[in-house]
Amino acid sequence: MKISEKWQKEWENKRVFDATPDPNKKKFFTTIAFPYPNSPFHLGHGRTYVTGDIYARYMRMRGYNVLFPMAFHYTGTPIIAMADDVAKGDKELIDIFKSIYEIPDDVISKLVDPLFMANYFKEEIKQAMKEIGLSIDWRREFTTIDPEFSSFIIWQFRKLQEKGFIVRDTHPVGWCPVHHIPVGMHDTKGDMEPEIGEFVLIYFDSDMGILPVATLRPETVFGAIAVWVNPHESYSIVEIDGKKYVMSEKASSKLSFQIDNLKVITVVKGSELVKHSAVNPITGKEVPIIGANFVDPLTGTGVVMSVPAHAPFDYFYLKKTKSELSIISVIRVEGMGETLAKDLVEKSNPQNDNDLKKLTEQVYRIEYNKGVMIDITKLVKPEYVEELKPLVNLPVPAARQKITEFITQKGLGRKIYEIMNRPVYCRCGNEVVVKILKDQWFLDYGNQEWKDLARKSIESIRFIPPEIKKDFEFVVDWLQKRACARTRGLGTPLPWDKKWIIESLSDSTIYMAFYTIAHRLKEHKLKPSQLTYEFWEYIMLGNGNPDEISKISGIPVEVIKAMRDEFLYWYPLDVRHSGKDLVPNHLSFFIFNHAAIFPHQLWPKGIAVNGFVLYDGKKMSKSLRNIVPLRKAIRMYSPDVIRIALTTNADIGSDVNFSDSYAKSIIDTLKNYYDLLEKLKEFKGEDEGFPEKWLKSKFYQMVINVTQYMDSLDLRSSSNEILYNFSSYINEYFELVRSEGREPNGKLLSQILQIWIKLLSPFAPHFAEELWHKIGKNTLVSLESWPIIDQSNVDLFIDLTHTYHRKLLNDIQAILSVYKDTPKSIKIFVANKEFLNVLRDAINIVQKGGQLRQLMEIHKPKGKQDARLYQKIYEEAREIDDDMKKLVTNFDFDEKDLLDKGLKYLSYKLGIKEIRILDASEMDRTKYNKDALPLRPAIIIE
């Protein structure tokens, strides 16, 4: 920690990462999602921020003028909800604050004040960011409740309103039933986005009232042969518009937020309902009401139709209850028949509800994608035959749409909304429901014009990893209206309706633009009242007259123009870093809002999305008590070890697994490099032989590889080269020079290690600074240039030559492992050079899909011995590895010369002094029944 603290102070004192426009340098503007300061950072937070910082440091070394700013997100309910929990004495939360985050009691008592909490955790998070080594320009820091930022958000929302992208409407939203506010991802525990989906209710008449069965598959109603209810749950008989309906008591409470005038008349037990029957409104058939424990009273209405031909649960439980009910098929799947659910249940023999859930997903997926409707006209009421005849032979998706329209238009049912990923809990602890919100302000992400702009933007964005692009395209397709304001929480009031506060996922979409001039607002001590709509209109879009704006605002015109210039220097944003959980909300809104407000040349250029962090293979959670505070982890292992551990043992889009053993292995690796630098002065050798040529080639090829990996943000491959492959190259170099009985070349090692420290710097900046100064440098390696790509130092022939030596070594060691006597000497018989040409031709023939006869036609064997050898060479060409293929196809060489270069190495590694290289023609065929093939010499041990 002493090393890291030393260099952090050095960076801060020298303002190393403050970014100022420089017309002579290419700019690189990167941001990471600003955090909610409602608790300290833990290891899971660290990955996204360190990933972004590694890339920022790399681009800085590549010669870019890098801007990497940071701010804090106070908006919305997360902070208020957390403060409320503290005020209520939430034992679990307070215990976590005490035992995991080690927050003093006297501080916890003050966390009941939302602003105290936000400011306290802001400083805690900021310190963690500094301790982990983030190269941030802190001059640009702000919070989202700063009045200056609020003026910017007011401008943004007026622009969106002008363009018709903000509407007042009625729409389903996630809703907290206690605080009576819309709920989005950042308002929920675990940051779960409430996913709202549609159920279709179909009205089955009964003498108890209408049973509104809830289904996602209305096209199967023709095959409904029963109605399920849960006999152990309470059911409400409710009145809606003068009619009686029966639904679970829990559903009636939930649906009261969607259905006006829903009035509970009485409550009965589900067991009372099973004494009755109901009538299918489409077929007119009377069906029994059956009790089933698997019916969830909180899903839909707690009333479900039973379609055993197409629902594994239904078939399984009907069979279990020995109900003698016929199965009615309505969907056919080519090659799989008309009773898919029944067939799969009987075939797979499910043991529990989890097995049934998997089968259900399988049946639904297959029938949706491949199913067509059979002739259902013989099943329906006579008066519906003509209207429903067009469903016959329709694919399931089209049939679902048509039957839904038929049901709703005929008054035979209606739609309701459900939280599809329930249970989702508001931060206050209550389960989120769906509410049909009236007269609410929405961002109209369903607007087709806006969707088209977003799609156009997506086409110009570089996505890392590339496959994440399709997820954004999917979001644009399904995204609809989203409530953009709340009546509770911190933030900016809606400018035209100030009882509403703009919510957290709506004021965090273009704030990256605010960074570009945030420090100038402070520098010139501008008042919020000066930051008018016209001011932002000019700074962000260049609209208006700066002289007029200066007169009205009192801001000097040169200051206004300078801020406009600085904005244009940094914008557009080059890359946005975030976790994959923000793809369906924040990151997509980020694309939409930029596309709506800015011209296309200022749209985002890149988005990098990373996976999560596991701890010992498990998700970090309160229940598992495996949350590790980031600052504590830094103290335990050091910042650079944490940086490497969080970013290098998985591809960027996959989850990283952090473990104590992995962190300690990184410590050992870094210590080995430190020890190597300590020993550098002991190496007095000056030879420039084969070992030195090989090491230079491997190292400079590594520089090329690392640069390519870093360009694509492949941190795993980069770090593998820098930390592990390089270590193996150094160790192998030492083996090579030992085999020659001499000292390593200290000068070469110093040159190489100097470059290697630069490669390491983005990943382990504190350790790299320490090593940099240890080798006598007095600059900051963080500000050094990235190594120049120099192909001239890469010698593929030297590299492949040693690969050949190692391959031969492995072959000899394999023979020695089964050799019973003590080996005294080795004879290596090398194939005649002419056979190398045969192998080259064989490789060419194999690559083109040719046959052995073509090789025979080219080289025309002189006898059976040649023909047999050619056949073996052809087989070798089919199996040869890539390295040996490169060697034989790219270079003209004598295999004996190749071996001569590795003779000392082989002797040293095998511990056998007498190794002779001979021509295959010198082999005594009567004594040794072996063939020497090109690159596969015959090995005789004596």
From Swiss-Prot:
CDD domains: Anticodon_Ia_Leu_AEc (cd07959), LeuRS_core (cd00812)
GO annotation, biological process: leucyl-tRNA aminoacylation
Pfam families, sorted: Anticodon_1, tRNA-synt_1
Compartments reported by the entry: Cytoplasm
GO molecular function: aminoacyl-tRNA deacylase activity; ATP binding; leucine-tRNA ligase activity
GO cellular component: cytoplasm
Residues bound to ATP: K622
InterPro entries: aa-tRNA-synth_Ia, Leu-tRNA-lgase_arc, Leu-tRNA-synth_Ia_arc/euk, M/V/L/I-tRNA-synth_anticd-bd, Rossmann-like_a/b/a_fold, tRNAsynth_Ia_anticodon-bd, Val/Leu/Ile-tRNA-synth_edit
Cross-referenced Gene3D superfamilies: Class I aminoacyl-tRNA synthetases (RS), HUPs, Isoleucyl-tRNA Synthetase, Domain 1, leucyl-tRNA synthetase, Valyl/Leucyl/Isoleucyl-tRNA synthetase, editing domain
The UniProt record lists the keyword Membrane: no
Motif 'KMSKS' region in this chain: 619-623
Keywords: Aminoacyl-tRNA synthetase, ATP-binding, Cytoplasm, Ligase, Nucleotide-binding, Protein biosynthesis
Annotated EC: 6.1.1.4
Substrates-to-products reaction catalysed: tRNA(Leu) + L-leucine + ATP = L-leucyl-tRNA(Leu) + AMP + diphosphate
HAMAP family: Leu_tRNA_synth_A
Protein name per its UniProtKB record: Leucine--tRNA ligase 2
Species per Swiss-Prot/TrEMBL record: Sulfolobus acidocaldarius (strain ATCC 33909 / DSM 639 / JCM 8929 / NBRC 15157 / NCIMB 11770)
Gene (name only): leuS2
